[in-house]
Amino acid sequence: MKESIAKVYRKTGETEIKSEINLYGEGKCDIKTGIVFLDHMLNLMARHGLIDLKLQAQGDLQVDSHHTVEDVGIVLGQCFKEALGDKKSIKRYGTSFIPMDEALASVSIDISGRPYIVCDFNFTVDKLGELDTELVEEFLRALTFNAGITLHARVLYGKNNHHMIEAVFKALGRALREAVDKDKRINGVMSTKGIL
């Protein structure tokens, strides 16, 4: 499949982030955000989505990880949107249910051009490594609104918070992979409006 590559660089008073993405890759990653647990989750997303991802981030982690996590979501969303280009022949929708031992998560995506997010998580700890668990939703919101997609993410059940979050990121990768997959039968874009 033809490569779909985009690069985004963003610098603010709080973070400096550069990213390169290939939506039709092999799941190769080089990710360094300064937040090891986030790096792990992004690696899982990329690997299971077969997305090649390079991402380097420096942020004001001495304050906390909020700015870095949110801004990584912003940059990845912008990169994703740019890499999609005209969206011709993509399937548009993707859904994945992923089990991780006792946990089960689902993610459904619509590459609609209409940003919207619904998350249903009930994490029972405040932090995993350096990552506040509440920032999982902040990351997804930033990604969603900058990519221009609708995203529904849910942990159906689970006990281990690491497993729950890991299942969400793997499901995100798989849902993205399904949604960006091209079907030669789709002439133009998958919309009766003619645009996405």
Curated annotation (Swiss-Prot):
Protein name: Imidazoleglycerol-phosphate dehydratase
One Pfam short name: IGPD
Signal peptide: none
Gene from which this protein is expressed: hisB
Subcellular location: Cytoplasm
Keyword Oxidoreductase listed: no
CDD domains: IGPD (cd07914)
Recorded superkingdom: Bacteria
Metabolic or biological pathway, per its Swiss-Prot or TrEMBL entry: Amino-acid biosynthesis; L-histidine biosynthesis; L-histidine from 5-phospho-alpha-D-ribose 1-diphosphate: step 6/9
